[in-house]
């Protein structure tokens, strides 16, 4: 049964064009981080049709700063089909990221959009392989993610959540190829008590040439807003 479920997951990721990023090379048990980030049922409790809004911000010393938005539109799938129909608008204009819609989504596809954009940005600033960065993130989520319970404040209440943190380039044997951009930490906050299950995604890239606590080179933050429609 587990192997069949994993096969379904791999097929879904392949349909999204991100198989090499987040699917294992061979069947193995999913880590707690993978389960909470990719496999949790994050959409079934939503209304029949709803739009979730996320605020995106980029700050830091390396490049121009900006703010933008992402939206997740969710509707019921056809009768007898498990999951939900989803459409994501991730950022706008020349910054927009396009991936195929999901017709049987169970997990929140905004996670995939965030990671795919991040990987493309790593390629842009380092000229390194997108597939390589995908693999680093995937392996770290499999084997070296830290998952801890936390409390967040959402919609006027304190609610239980989990924070997943990864440092995918810390022990990379090829780190010397992109040393300046390798100090990059990621955190993902997920909760059953917020619409869509994903509250926040955050990455911080620090400059190895500056003292700890200096302003980051890149700080990117995506946060669920409270104005679902």
Residue ranges: model-predicted function:
Residues 1-9:
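Bacterial N-terminal signal peptides that target proteins for export
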Residues 6, 121, 138-142:
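General helical structural elements
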Residues 9-17:
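Bacterial N-terminal signal peptides
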Residues 19-23:
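Sec/Tat signal peptide C-region and signal peptidase I cleavage site
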Residues 24-101, 127-229:
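Acidic, serine/threonine-rich low-complexity disordered tracts
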Residues 96-121:
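Surface-exposed, glycine/proline- and aromatic-rich loop segments on solvent-exposed faces
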């Amino acid at each position: 049964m587990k192997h069949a479920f994993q096969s379904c997951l791999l097929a879904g990721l392949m349909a999204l064009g991100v198989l090499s990023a987040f699917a294992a090379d061979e069947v193995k048990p999913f880590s707690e981080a993978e389960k909470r980030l990719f496999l949790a049922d994050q959409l079934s409790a939503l209304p029949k049709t709803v739009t979730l809004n996320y605020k995106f911000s980029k700050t830091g010393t390396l490049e121009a700063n900006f703010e933008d938005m992402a939206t997740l539109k969710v509707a019921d799938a056809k009768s007898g089909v498990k999951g939900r129909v989803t459409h994501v608008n991730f950022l706008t204009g020349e910054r927009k990221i396009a991936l195929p819609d999901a017709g049987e989504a169970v997990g929140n596809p905004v996670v995939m959009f965030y990671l795919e954009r991040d990987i493309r940005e790593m390629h842009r600033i380092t000229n390194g392989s997108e597939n390589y960065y995908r693999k680093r993130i995937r392996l770290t989520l499999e084997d070296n993610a830290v998952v801890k319970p936390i409390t967040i404040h959402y919609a006027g209440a304190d609610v239980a959540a989990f924070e997943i943190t990864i440092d995918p380039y810390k022990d990379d044997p090829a780190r010397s190829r992109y040393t300046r951009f390798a100090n990059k930490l990621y955190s993902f906050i997920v909760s059953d008590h917020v619409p869509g299950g994903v509250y926040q995604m955050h990455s911080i890239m620090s400059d190895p040439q500056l003292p700890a606590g200096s302003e980051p080179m890149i700080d990117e933050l995506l946060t669920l807003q409270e104005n679902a429609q």
